[in-house]
Amino acid sequence: LKCNKLVPLFYKTCPAGKNLCYKMFMVSNK
């Protein structure tokens, strides 16, 4: 599954790239 940086709940479901998904989410939220 690809992490959707537009959905804050979705990055939590990313098992391998949790930190990466979180960073992408934060960057898109800047």
UniProtKB/Swiss-Prot annotation:
Keywords: Cardiotoxin, Cytolysis, Disulfide bond, Membrane, Secreted, Target cell membrane, Target membrane, Toxin. It is found in: Secreted; Target cell membrane. SUPFAM superfamilies: Snake toxin-like. Expressed by the venom gland. GO terms for cellular component: extracellular region; membrane; other organism cell membrane. Disulfide bonds join 3-21. This is Cytotoxin najalgesin. It comes from Naja atra. The lineage of its organism: Eukaryota, Metazoa, Chordata, Craniata, Vertebrata.
